[in-house]
A protein has these predicted regions:
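Start-transfer (signal-anchor) and selected internal transmembrane alpha helices
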Residues: 1-22
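Alpha-helical transmembrane segments and terminal signal-anchor/GPI-anchor hydrophobic tails
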Residues: 25-41, 163, 169-292
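Short hydrophobic/aromatic helix or loop-helix immediately within or flanking a transmembrane segment
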Residues: 36-82, 252-253, 257-258
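Transmembrane-helix motifs of polytopic, lipid-linked glycan transferases
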Residues: 74-75, 86-107, 283-287
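Transmembrane and membrane-interface helices of multi-pass
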Residues: 95-96, 111-120
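Membrane-interface transmembrane helices that cradle and orient dolichyl/undecaprenyl
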Residues: 106-108, 138-151
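Membrane-interface helix-loop-helix junctions at transmembrane boundaries of multi-pass membrane enzymes
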Residues: 107, 146, 285-306
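Short acidic/glycine- and proline-prone juxtamembrane loop motifs at membrane-interface regions
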Residues: 125-132
C-alpha cells in the first residue's frame, strides 16, 4: 500500500482535508480573529514578487519569525497570493507530506484519526506559522528518537527563529538522549534532573526575572487597558517572588492550561468544541501510553520530561484563553505523534531481540 503513498480511504479523507481552508476565513469567522495571518501573506507575496523581505521595523520582534515563515510557505508550489487564506494551502501540503512519511511507521487508520483533530484542521486551514512549528517539531523529536545527531540540530535552527520557547523545551529532549544517554537507562535522567535543579537554584533570580517578563506581558496583553494599565501594586501581585511560588503556581495552573477553556467559560460553539477536544487530547495521550506500555521506556521518560517542562512554563504565563489554547495544541501535537512513533520503535526493537 505504501507504493501508492496512501490508501483509498485516506485519499478520500484528504480531499476533505484540503478543502477546509474554504470553511474558516470569511465563513466561520472574520480573518482578523487570527490577525497574524496578514503578516505572513503580505510578506510572502512581497517575497515572491521582489525576492527580498519587506521592512518590518514597525513589528519589532516579529521580523525574523514572519520572514522565515513566509519564505518557507511562500515558495512552496501553491497558487498566487490572492487572499489571506492563500498560505493555508502550503500548510496543507506540508502536512500531507508529513502524513505520507509518518505512514511508513504508524498505521494509517490510527494516524488519520489524529490528523482529523479539530485544532489541526483549523490551524492548517489558516495562513499561520503554527503548522510549520509542529512540522519541524515532529521531525526533530523523531530524528532524536532515532538518535541522529546532526539532523535534529539543523531542524532546531528554524524553530529557534520561529518559536524559541518551543525550541527550548525540545532541546531538553535532545540533551537527554544524546548527552545523558536517556535512551538507554533512567540513570542519566536522574543525573540530568539533579543538575537542572541545581542550576535553577543557582540562577534563580535570573530565571524568575525571565518568567516574570513573559507573565506580565501576557497578563497586560489580556487586560482591558492593555500595556501600561497596571500600577506597581498590580505588577508586584502578578510577579512570582520565589522558586517555591513558581512551582506551586505552575503545578496548580497546569490543569487550567491543559483543559482550558472549561465548558462554563465557552463564549461560543467554537470554544465549546475546544473544551471537548482538550479532554480528548489528554485521554488520547494516556491511551497511547497505556496501550504501548511506554512507561517502561527511558526514551518515553525523556520525552515526558521535555513535555512537562513546556507545560509547566506555559502554565505560569497563561492568561489569554484563545492564545494559550493555540499554544497548547502546538506544544502537545508533536508529542502525540512522537508517542505513537515510539510505540512502533519499541515494538520493532522487541521483535529484533526475539529473532
Amino acid at each position: 500500500m505504501h507504493k501508492k503513498l496512501i490508501n483509498l480511504n485516506t485519499f478520500i479523507i484528504f480531499q476533505f482535508f484540503f478543502l477546509t481552508p474554504f470553511l474558516f476565513n470569511f465563513v466561520l469567522f472574520d480573518p482578523r480573529y487570527f490577525g497574524d495571518q496578514y503578516f505572513y501573506v503580505i510578506e510572502a507575496a512581497h517575497l515572491r514578487e521582489n525576492f527580498s523581505p519587506m521592512s518590518l521595523d514597525g513589528f519589532i520582534g516579529w521580523g525574523q519569525q514572519v520572514t522565515l515563515t513566509s519564505v518557507i510557505l511562500g515558495f512552496l508550489p501553491i497558487p498566487a497570493m490572492v487572499s489571506v487564506t492563500s498560505l493555508a494551502f502550503a500548510n496543507k501540503l506540508i502536512f500531507f507530506f508529513l502524513f505520507v512519511w509518518l505512514a511508513r511507521y504508524i498505521p494509517e487508520n490510527r494516524l488519520i484519526l489524529i490528523f482529523l483533530l479539530p485544532s489541526l484542521l483549523l490551524y492548517t486551514s489558516l495562513s499561520l506559522r503554527d503548522p510549520l512549528i509542529m512540522f519541524f517539531s515532529i521531525f526533530f523529536l523523531i530524528f532524536t528518537l532515532q538518535e541522529r545527531k546532526l539532523l535534529p540540530i539543523l531542524l532546531l535552527i528554524p524553530l529557534i527563529i520561529i518559536k524559541p520557547q518551543n525550541a527550548l523545551f525540545l532541546s531538553l529532549f535532545y540533551v537527554l538522549i544524546i548527552f545523558f544517554r536517556g535512551s538507554m537507562s533512567f540513570k542519566g535522567l536522574y543525573i540530568f534532573l539533579i543538575i537542572t535543579a541545581a542550576l535553577i537554584i543557582l540562577f534563580q533570580e535570573r530565571f524568575l526575572e525571565i518568567m516574570n517578563v513573559y507573565r506580565l506581558a501576557f497578563a497586560m496583553e489580556d487586560s482591558v487597558g492593555g500595556y501600561g494599565s497596571f500600577d506597581d501594586d498590580q505588577v508586584y501581585a502578578l510577579e512570582i517572588q520565589s522558586l517555591f511560588g513558581f512551582f506551586i503556581s505552575s503545578i496548580t495552573n497546569s490543569i487550567n492550561f491543559l483543559l482550558m477553556p472549561f465548558p462554563w467559560e465557552a463564549r461560543n460553539l467554537f470554544y465549546l468544541l475546544q473544551s471537548f477536544e482538550s479532554l480528548v487530547i489528554i485521554g488520547l495521550i494516556f491511551f497511547i501510553i497505556r496501550e504501548g506500555k511506554l512507561y517502561h521506556s527511558p526514551k518515553f521518560a525523556s520525552l515526558l520530561i521535555s513535555l512537562v517542562a513546556g507545560v509547566l512554563m506555559y502554565s505560569v504565563i497563561a492568561f489569554n484563553t484563545g492564545t494559550f489554547v493555540r499554544y497548547r495544541f502546538v506544544l502537545l501535537f508533536p508529542y502525540i505523534i512522537s508517542f505513537l512513533y515510539l510505540v512502533y520503535l519499541e515494538e520493532d526493537a522487541t521483535l529484533s531481540n526475539d529473532r
